[in-house]
Structure formats: C-alpha cells, structure tokens
C-alpha cells in the first residue's frame, strides 16, 4: 500500500470517527476521544514520512478527497473542542454554585472596609 493510499485510509477512518455522535457516558466519550487522538497520531506519522507527488488522475483525485475530508475533520474537531470547553465551564459554574450553598458565609466581608463617599 502506498503512503498516499495509507493516508487516504487513515483520513477516511478519522472522518468516520469524528462524525460519529459522541456518547453521553463520560467513560465511553473519553474512549472515543482516545481513538480519534490515536488516528491523528498515525496520520501525522504517515505525513511526516513523506508522500510521493501525485502523477496520474487517480492519485490527484485521492489528494482532493483527502484535502476535503481534512477540512471537514478540522471543522468538526474545532466544534468538539468548543463543546468540551463549554462543558468544562458549566462544570466550573456548577461547582462554584454548590460551594456557595455549602459555605454561604465564606465570601469576603465588608467589615473594616473604608468606603469613600467622595468621588
């Protein structure tokens, strides 16, 4: 198998994994993310080894497909990253709200603070 065909196969696998819906279960989702990360590493290794220049029409078509799918993969990974950041922020807010309920008088006090009424 040529490196171009190998890259095409890895790109197709990655495209399928990225566009599969993420599982709501945290452990299964983490496993999916690990699989995606592994495919990205394998794909990067194939790209680092070097690719031959496409000479015939079939090779050029494969390269076009790889480029189109790579763009779609990048967009989907950015979307997934945004979702993960949003979930992290929601978790932090939930944690902060729970802390306020657990320790309602833990915040800063206004005792001993000088308020300057002049402006």
Curated annotation (Swiss-Prot):
Subcellular location(s) of the protein: Cytoplasm, Cytosol
Keywords annotated in UniProt: Bacterial flagellum biogenesis, Chaperone, Cytoplasm
GO CC terms in record: cytosol
GO terms classed as biological process: bacterial-type flagellum organization
Cystines in this chain: none
Domain of life: Bacteria
Primary location group: cytoplasm
Subunit structure: Homodimer.
Protein role: May act as an export chaperone for the filament capping protein FliD.
Family: Belongs to the bacillales FliT family.
Protein known as: Flagellar protein FliT
Record organism: Halalkalibacterium halodurans (strain ATCC BAA-125 / DSM 18197 / FERM 7344 / JCM 9153 / C-125)
């Amino acid at each position: 198998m040529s490196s171009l065909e190998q890259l095409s196969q890895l790109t197709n696998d990655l495209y399928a994994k990225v566009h599969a819906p993420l599982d709501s279960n945290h452990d299964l989702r983490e496993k999916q993310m690990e699989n995606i990360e592994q495919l990205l590493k394998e794909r990067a290794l194939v790209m680092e080894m070097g690719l031959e220049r496409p000479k015939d029409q079939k090779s050029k078509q494969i390269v076009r497909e790889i480029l189109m799918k790579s763009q779609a993969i990048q967009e989907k990974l950015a979307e997934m990253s945004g979702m993960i950041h949003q979930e992290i922020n929601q978790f932090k807010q939930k944690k902060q709200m729970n802390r306020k309920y657990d320790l309602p008088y833990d915040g800063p006090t206004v005792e001993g603070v000088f308020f300057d009424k002049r402006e």
